[in-house]
Structures are given as C-alpha cells and as structure tokens.
Amino acid sequence: MPTINQLVRKPRKSKVEKSDSPALNIGYNSHRKVHTKLSAPQKRGVATRVGTMTPKKPNSALRKFARVRLSNLIEVTAYIPGIGHNLQEHSVVLIRGGRVKDLPGVRYHIVRGALDTAGVADRKQGRSKYGAKRPKG
C-alpha cells in the first residue's frame, strides 16, 4: 500500500484499453497520404488471397479465410463464415470485427451477402447472419 506522499509524487496509471479490431479504427486520407483516427463498424476491402487453414488443438477442420487489403491500406486476415463461398482474388468484400477463437491471427469476419460476397445458399435458420434471402412459400 503506497503512502499519500508516494501517490502525490507518482500517481496511479489507468489501464490503456486495447481494441479487439484495430484496423477498423484507422482511416486513410489519400490526398495527404496519411492515416487518420476514424472508427468504423465495417470496412471495405479487396481480397488478395483466399485459402484454408487448420485450427489450433484440439479442433480439426479446414477453415476458410481471406487476406484482405482494406480501404485504409491495411492488410488483415478475415474469416469466411458459412458453408461454401464464391470469393476469389480481387473480390470486393465488407469486413466486420470479431475474432475466430481457434484460428490465431484472425480478428475479422467477412459479411456475407454484402458487395461481391454471396449469401449462404439453402440456409433456413439464422439467415440474417449469412445474408440468405427468405425462402419462397
């Protein structure tokens, strides 16, 4: 327990809160070629690589991911949710925050049904999360 005098000399430091998705908090001024502070719920980007990766132990699968260059020129790894996708290199995608627990380094999700990303076909439940239209009938 510090004395009052010690606290006067060197006050307590408050904890710095770190963002879970830092690339969404950076904008880019292309005219001045500088990064700016600009928080956004989603960001647009171009897929530079689409592939699969294996999760950490004890899980086993081939999880789909895309490497995306955002509109603020930052490159991030984003997860492609749902069964099947139509993404390829140079597809324009929308990303949101949200990590994938068993994929190290994946802190973003691609929004299905937005821009070049198609919704999940034949999905009946939880459709809004996968950009699926309401079935006829």
Swiss-Prot record:
Top-rank taxon, per record: Bacteria
An example molecular function term from Gene Ontology annotations: tRNA binding
Keywords (A to Z) from UniProt: Methylation, Ribonucleoprotein, Ribosomal protein, RNA-binding, rRNA-binding, tRNA-binding
Listed InterPro entries: NA-bd_OB-fold (IPR012340), Ribosomal_uS12 (IPR006032), Ribosomal_uS12_bac (IPR005679)
Modification sites for 3-methylthioaspartic acid: 102
Subunit note: Part of the 30S ribosomal subunit. Contacts proteins S8 and S17. May interact with IF1 in the 30S initiation complex.
Name of the protein described by the UniProt record: Small ribosomal subunit protein uS12
Name of the gene: rpsL
